[in-house]
């Protein structure tokens, strides 16, 4: 299994992959939940897909065939990868219209940043979320770039931010404490 942005990619036997996006309320569980929508039978075990709001999505595709999965086919670089550089971010922000928060959340610009982390990044950088992306100075873009790396590394180390009863595979809630909310 691997991850790309907010997509989970499961390599199956043969030439196929199962692509899952949990959206806001989706969960993969080892026990049946109130909102179980699908049960996977794997080597004598069961894996339950639970989704209160029915927003999650699944795709069964040939390995590497992501062109028909809208968000995955056009996804930008991972924010903690070597391909997410300061020069890349400067180039994108100077060309992209719209408010900086919306641009950061655009998965074609940078993979995996959602509402909470966009707010955290901009707060750390001292940039108003409603600022037009094209109006940012080089110094402000550098602050956003550095804040992106810092906030996401902190969140990863803390197991992420947890709303409601969402937990990791070991049943533990994330301990990242947002500064904005």
PLM feature segments, named:
Residues 1-181:
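Structured catalytic/nucleic-acid-binding cores of DNA maintenance enzymes
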